[in-house]
Amino acid sequence: MLAKFAALAALVASANAQAVCSLTAETHPSLNWSKCTSSGCTNVAGSITVDANWRWTHITSGSTNCYSGNEWDTSLCSTNTDCATKCCVDGAEYSSTYGIQTSGNSLSLQFVTKGSYSTNIGSRTYLMNGADAYQGFELLGNEFTFDVDVSGTGCGLNGALYFVSMDLDGGKAKYTNNKAGAKYGTGYCDAQCPRDLKYINGIANVEGWTPSTNDANAGIGDHGTCCSEMDIWEANKVSTAFTPHPCTTIEQHMCEGDSCGGTYSDDRYGGTCDADGCDFNSYRMGNTTFYGEGKTVDTSSKFTVVTQFIKDSAGDLAEIKRFYVQNGKVIENSQSNVDGVSGNSITQSFCNAQKTAFGDIDDFNKKGGLKQMGKALAKPMVLVMSIWDDHAANMLWLDSTYPVEGGPGAYRGECPTTSGVPAEVEANAPNSKVIFSNIKFGPIGSTFSGGSSGTPPSNPSSSVKPVTSTAKPSSTSTASNPSGTGAAHWAQCGGIGFSGPTTCQSPYTCQKINDYYSQCV
């Protein structure tokens, strides 16, 4: 993800504070999800918390803000240790202040929420395991599925669902000054090594703090916080991408200044993490009719997103595979339509070919590539769900042409290059929202199924501004045939309308997922 800015209006100051106050009670909204096995799924009674960077932070002895607008009040504290001692984070009023609502297994995130004392912009939430710990997910060799409604998110917005290698307790045990922990949403990190957090590693980030020139609620400090990141879903109703971001150091770690790299530093590639990642955006890969309103995956209504993290015989991450389910039909991810880049999933060979075809800087392999990402996925990662706008690049990297002058790989969506300006998005689309629901996690093949009527749609032919000298015709949404006899491990091997191989390479067998999709397992 290119950036994830915290934004909260002046009267509700934001900070990743380490102390805790109780002027507002903290009650986590409940959010159910399902843990699945080959025999079925069981309900898990979970909850969510909002990130500490959105919370009201004030002096421990009263209600005076420690941070207002985009500046620290240095008359109250001026050093990292001093602010950690004198300031506290408080409880959250989830619906009225942040526009966060839950119902059963559904989470709704409102973009702009006008409360009695503040106007809140966006939010970042985490799935909890009890009151004091984040829920951990070991994704390698497993499958993660959720429903999403992006019909209320247009150009310049990102309704994101992703995983990061945060400490499950929010860093409370590692950093003894942190008295808030996961309960209050502390400990965030990602592959951008963000420097906009007010507290990192149990101390404040006030030293060297520079207010943003285009965000009235944010700034950057000397320190950043880094860890591995797996973007399962970055999307609005125009475009979507899924992207692994490996780091040479997997777990949360603090960085300093431009050595952080990422969006917040002058040297983007100077840190421990791959800020760009290896992304699969169907539009960018040459299919302009696969995702969007009225397209193969129709974003005007809810659909299901399935992501599989497939291991090879050595136990390393070999492939990140994507399916959609809509109106009871399984839809395979679109095939690449870029010369020299084949496939419809993320593999090491796909990433190598894409970097070459687009002429991108290959920091992905410098940071360990897919194998290093797999090491992070083998350990517990924290689920993040957010909605945000982009003060760094207006979200053009997701849904428009970026860089704006064009070139190989620049065409990412239909939004104008003049779109996504945060001040305009906030003023013109305040009621935007994203809804995540029906989260499921389990072994591959355990979390999704399709209906029993109709025929699955195919990917129609499409055209896109050329990313290489010659564009290939679009492929239909069927798995590529492997070499040898039968379909390869995890490939499609049957279903209504499927014309490929119906047997599997030894020792795998063809397992029916539903009437429209069978898979070699």
Swiss-Prot record:
InterPro entries: CBD_sf, Cellulose-bd_dom_fun, ConA-like_dom_sf, Glyco_hydro_7, Glyco_hydro_7_sf. It is found in: Secreted. Disulfide bonds join C493-C510, C504-C520. It is an enzyme of class 3 (hydrolase). One of its GO terms (cellular component) is extracellular region. GO terms for biological process: cellulose catabolic process; glucan catabolic process. Its EC number is 3.2.1.91. The keyword Nucleotidyltransferase does not apply. It comes from the Eukaryota. Residues 485-521 form the CBM1 domain. GO terms for molecular function: cellulose 1,4-beta-cellobiosidase activity; cellulose binding. Its main location: secreted. It catalyses: Hydrolysis of (1->4)-beta-D-glucosidic linkages in cellulose and cellotetraose, releasing cellobiose from the non-reducing ends of the chains. Residues 451-485 are annotated as: Linker. The active site is at E229, E234. PROSITE patterns: CBM1_1, CBM1_2. CDD domains: GH7_CBH_EG. This is Exoglucanase 1.
